[in-house]
Amino acid sequence: MTQRGRAAKPTGPTGRPRRTGGQRGTDRVGRGGDLATRRARLHQVVEPVVQGAGYDLEDLSVSRAGRRHVVQVIVDADGGVDLDAVADVSRAVSAALDAAEEVGGDIVAGEYQLEVSSPGVARPLTLPRHWRRNTGRLVRFTVRGGPEAVDRQVTGRVVEADDERVVVETDAGRTEWRHAELGPGRVQVEFTRPGEPDAFDGTDEAGDFDDDDVEDEER
C-alpha cells in the first residue's frame, strides 16, 4: 500500500485556497453538492486513471480518520499487482485528483490521505475475474440452494474459472458451478500449498508494506 496526502494548509501547491476543516460531525467529501455527488465525481476521476494504467478498480472508498479523510483505492490485474505498479498508480491518481480540483474545486475537503493497495486475501471473491485470478487457491464459499433447498458451505481448490463457471476440487472430487449458484468466496490462508515445499517465504504481498516502505507525502 502506498500513501499520499494533502495537509490542511491555507493554500495548495499552486496557491489555490484550500479549506482547512469541515463541519463537525459530518463526512463531507468536498465543497458544494451532496456527499453522493462528490463520491461520484471522485469515481469519475479515479477509475479512468486506473483502467488507463491497465488495472481494474476493485474498490474506492472515503472514510474519516480524525480530522482528515482517507481515500482508499484498491486495484488488481491478472497476474497481480507489484509494489512498483501500486506506486505508479498512486502517483497517477494523485496527479489526476490535483488536476480535477484545479478545474472544478475540491473533491475532498481539507486534509486527505490517498491510500492505494492491492486487494489482499481478505477481500471476498464476487466477480468472475476474482475467481479466475485465484485459480489454484483454497477457497471457502456458499453454494446457493435455491428456493426449496438449503445453502451449504464448501471448501475446495479452484481448478478452473471463466466468465460463466467455476470448477472446484474438493475431497469428494471436482464439481462445476455457475457463478449465479455461488455466494462470495473467501481465500483460505495456506502456509504450504500443494506442490510447493514452503509457500511462506517471508516476503510481503503487493498490498502489504513495512513502515519503511510507505511513502507519505504531505502537500
Swiss-Prot record:
GO terms for biological process: ribosomal small subunit assembly; translation. Pfam families: RimP_N. It comes from the Bacteria. Keywords: Cytoplasm, Ribosome biogenesis. It is found in: Cytoplasm. Residues 198-219 have a biased composition (Acidic residues). Residues 1-38, 189-219 are annotated as: Disordered. Coiled coil: none annotated. Transmembrane segments: none annotated. The keyword Electron transport does not apply. GO terms for cellular component: cytosol. Belongs to the RimP family. This is Ribosome maturation factor RimP.
